[in-house]
């Protein structure tokens, strides 16, 4: 149900941005079973916005908002709950492209999948804010003519680059 694993991905990739603390359930559960499993779990993430329904191969098939689960009757099947379009992020996708996907589709969170399409993590809008901050900082440095040089570089080192 809950997955934790240590992953190493390139610095500018979605894999580096993602959290490996997420909630995934099977579509054959009902709302009551899902809520009961949350209550007894010692492994539940502190914050989460969506529950991912996965097939037997751990491939995401739907995302259901936590608010949708809370508003539904206990006997309603998870697969019958309304879910939004599932936008999946590849673990090796560049973080700037991930930020673009969040902006384009107005995402709160998105599942991250490996090269086999299996769910391995989640990226939230909070993570993307950091990407935008970093990109804005880079843009400001470029506008100021600083480029990739370290601020601690001497004037001679900077001008020779």
Regions found by a protein language model. Name each.
Residues 3-161:
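Cytosolic regulatory modules rich in charged/polar residues
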